[in-house]
Amino acid sequence: GTNAAMRKAFNYQDTAKNGKKCSGCAQFVPGASPTAAGGCKVIPGDNQIAPGGYCDAFIVKK
């Protein structure tokens, strides 16, 4: 499912922004494969986060 309220709060989008994307973010919880949808530590209850997406909570993965 998705968490529409939290997605909106963080301005989530399904596309990368300035080269930043969910798969490169410390908050992203990867799905079954590198291209599969995953989860996010700041958007609870949402398992449809795109690896190539972006939101304002982006923190570069170390």
Swiss-Prot record:
GO terms for molecular function: 4 iron, 4 sulfur cluster binding; electron transfer activity; metal ion binding. The keyword 4Fe-4S applies. Keywords: 4Fe-4S, Electron transport, Iron, Iron-sulfur, Metal-binding, Transport. [4Fe-4S] cluster binds at residues 22, 25, 40, 55. It comes from the Bacteria. Pfam families: HIPIP. SUPFAM superfamilies: HIPIP (high potential iron protein). GO terms for biological process: aerobic electron transport chain. InterPro entries: High_potential_FeS_prot (IPR000170), HIPIP_sf (IPR036369). Specific class of high-redox-potential 4Fe-4S ferredoxins. Functions in anaerobic electron transport in most purple and in some other photosynthetic bacteria and in at least one genus (Paracoccus) of halophilic, denitrifying bacteria. Homodimer. Belongs to the high-potential iron-sulfur protein (HiPIP) family. This is High-potential iron-sulfur protein. It comes from Rhodocyclus tenuis. The lineage of its organism: Bacteria, Pseudomonadati, Pseudomonadota, Betaproteobacteria, Rhodocyclales. The gene is hip.
